[in-house]
């Protein structure tokens, strides 16, 4: 929401680099590291996740390095102006695919942090990113849009399995709204593993930890 124009431009470059990596994977064999790089890269471009241009540039370099590790002739980065300046119907369909994958990558990344991954998801990220670079019409793009929704359900099931197998099945819980005296940390997002680590690190130190937004289920 509040990123600078410089950061917005870099996030487009990062997305273009990810599309190039996906296209490289069409002729090379992706690895578990490839999957992780794709997740990290897409997650970086989710709204309000990153505002730091240096961090984004590091991620771009990481994507390029992964492409180079897979092939002596990796695919070129995709120029995102080709998507943003396309016919409005094509732009809308490709945007649905892109934004759907960005959200899905966040969930898949959290699942991966808890030791859960899916070959089906990895294959779709490559397929979906590659589709963004194709000069396709509505008939070719609509099935990819529908598949994005279907695979998203698979991703949500994977995250649910990762969370419940690690922390148990959620039950209705009373959440206190009291603001305690003393230093505090507010945590948002979906990363329960980060919350667990933070609670361990602050235990007995007089630091209060509060949840915000999507972190409510941690209770």
Residue ranges and their predicted role:
Residues 1-219:
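Metallocofactor- and cofactor-centric catalytic cores in central/energy metabolism, strongly enriched
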């Amino acid at each position: 929401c509040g990123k600078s124009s410089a950061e917005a431009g870099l996030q487009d470059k990062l997305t273009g680099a990810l599309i190039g990596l996906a296209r490289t994977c069409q002729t090379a064999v992706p690895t578990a590291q490839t999957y992780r790089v794709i997740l990290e890269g897409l997650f970086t471009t989710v709204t309000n996740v990153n505002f730091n241009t240096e961090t984004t540039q590091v991620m771009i370099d990481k994507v390029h390095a992964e492409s180079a590790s897979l092939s002596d002739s990796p695919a070129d980065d995709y120029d995102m102006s080709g998507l943003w300046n396309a016919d409005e119907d094509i732009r809308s369909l490709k945007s649905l695919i892109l934004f759907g994958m960005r959200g899905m990558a966040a969930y898949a990344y959290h699942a991966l942090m808890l030791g859960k991954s899916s070959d089906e998801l990895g294959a779709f990220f490559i397929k979906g990113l590659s589709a963004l670079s194709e000069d396709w019409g509505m008939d070719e793009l609509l099935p990819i849009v529908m598949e994005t929704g279907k695979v998203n359900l698979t991703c949500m099931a994977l995250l649910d399995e990762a969370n419940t197998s690690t922390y148990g099945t959620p039950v209705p819980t009373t959440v206190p709204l009291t603001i305690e005296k003393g230093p505090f940390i507010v945590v948002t997002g979906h990363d329960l593993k980060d919350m667990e680590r933070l609670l361990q690190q602050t235990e007995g130190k007089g630091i209060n930890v509060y949840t915000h937004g999507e972190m409510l289920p941690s209770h």
